[in-house]
């Protein structure tokens, strides 16, 4: 059966179309994300450390980010033939839908496979560790967040650059190009960049304070 992806000559044997509508896929994604956000916000609000709102939002970011890497991207990484799924599996439906904006997920493009493999195995678990570090006020919190954000920013940069170098031909329509490839993909550039700036300032301030104390004593 023919597929909706670009380029049209992409070979996907036994392709099975989505059994769920686009709105249904987005609705389930939204519900799951909101539930995680709600739980983390409530838990962080009861922390004896009296976390700032920024730290609480960062905990949400790392929780959602980590779960996406481990669960959503983990499913894709270990399910090379998700596009054949006939059961209506939620995760298969998500990736069939997202592939309309970037068919490299359906074709298992080596660049995407490498980037997502690192995200699934390393970045996902480390993101949950970053959430824990913020909650407990661990000394490694800022350096861990900076390192993770740098990896996410670098991986997302490669994600976009490799697509551009190959002619930006992987979205089936301009709508999916901008809403999926650009908007959703760009999230992994914007938020990591903002977190890196914040962590950089905090780390530099801590180093200056340490230098000052060293000179005093």
Curated annotation (Swiss-Prot):
The chain crosses the membrane at residues 25-45, 58-78, 110-130, 143-163, 177-197. It comes from the Eukaryota. One of its GO terms (cellular component) is endoplasmic reticulum. Residues 54-196 form the EXPERA domain. InterPro entries: EBP (IPR007905), EXPERA (IPR033118). GO terms for molecular function: C-8 sterol isomerase activity; cholestenol delta-isomerase activity; steroid Delta-isomerase activity. Its EC number is 5.3.3.-. PROSITE patterns: EXPERA. Pathway: Secondary metabolite biosynthesis; terpenoid biosynthesis. Its main location: membrane. It holds the Pfam family EBP. It is found in: Membrane. It is a multi-pass membrane protein. Keywords: Isomerase, Lipid biosynthesis, Lipid metabolism, Membrane, Steroid biosynthesis, Steroid metabolism, Sterol biosynthesis, Sterol metabolism, Transmembrane, Transmembrane helix. GO terms for biological process: sterol biosynthetic process. It catalyses: 7,8-epoxymelianol = isomeliandiol. The keyword Ubl conjugation does not apply. Expressed in maturing fruits and in juice vesicles. PANTHER family: 3-BETA-HYDROXYSTEROID-DELTA(8),DELTA(7)-ISOMERASE, STEROL ISOMERASE. Belongs to the EBP family. Isomerase involved in the biosynthesis of limonoids triterpene natural products such as limonin, a compound with insecticidal activity responsible for the bitter taste in citrus. Catalyzes the conversion of 7,8-epoxymelianol to isomeliandiol via skeletal rearrangements. This is Isomeliandiol synthase MOI2. It comes from Citrus sinensis.
């Amino acid at each position: 059966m023919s597929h909706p992806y670009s380029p049209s000559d992409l070979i996907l044997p036994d392709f099975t179309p989505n059994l769920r509508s686009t709105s249904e896929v987005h609705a389930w994604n939204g519900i799951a994300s909101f539930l995680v956000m709600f739980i983390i916000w409530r838990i962080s609000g009861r922390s004896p450390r009296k976390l700032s709102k920024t730290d609480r939002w960062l905990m949400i970011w790392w929780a959602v980010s980590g779960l996406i890497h481990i669960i959503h991207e983990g499913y894709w990484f270990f399910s090379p033939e998700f596009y054949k799924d006939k059961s209506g599996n939620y995760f298969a439906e998500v990736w069939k839908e997202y592939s309309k904006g970037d068919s490299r997920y359906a074709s298992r493009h080596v660049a995407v496979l490498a980037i997502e493999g690192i995200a699934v195995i390393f970045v996902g678990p480390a993101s949950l560790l970053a959430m824990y570090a913020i909650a407990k006020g661990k000394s490694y919190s800022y350096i861990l967040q900076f390192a993770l954000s740098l990896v996410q920013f670098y991986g997302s940069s490669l994600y976009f650059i490799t697509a551009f170098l190959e002619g930006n031909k992987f979205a089936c329509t301009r709508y999916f190009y901008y809403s999926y490839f650009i908007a959703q993909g760009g999230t992994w550039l914007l938020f990591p960049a903002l977190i890196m700036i914040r962590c950089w300032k905090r780390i530099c301030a801590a180093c200056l304070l340490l230098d000052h104390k060293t000179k005093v004593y």
